[in-house]
Amino acid sequence: MNLYHNDMFDVFPNIEPQSIDLLLTDFPYGTLNKRRNEWDKIIDYDRFWHYVDIICKPNCAIVSTASQPFTSVLISTNYTNFKYCLVWEKSKSTGYLNAKKQPMRSHEDIVVFYKKQPTYNPQMTV
């Protein structure tokens, strides 16, 4: 298994075509103060999906964490291959600074894309 922790656009050109079984990512949401947080910029999704077509096997699952409104934006970048969302219930809520103005956030979405059905091992739990 190879695990990369880097800018994907620096890594993708060096990956062998059709060699990826699972692409797990946590994209920048683009929801923070854009003047101070250079790392939270929305990526070029056309470029991302182009590379995915090259490096991923047809039954590769592309999985990303997200939260609204970014979840909707992410799904819209590849509606054709979007399959479903799961909900990650966090053990600790976030958003304490706005707790007097809105509910704290206790979950994130897990967004799943693929072209062909990947291996799926149901856990049969509720």
What are these regions (language model features)?
Residues M1-V126:
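Core catalytic lobe of class I
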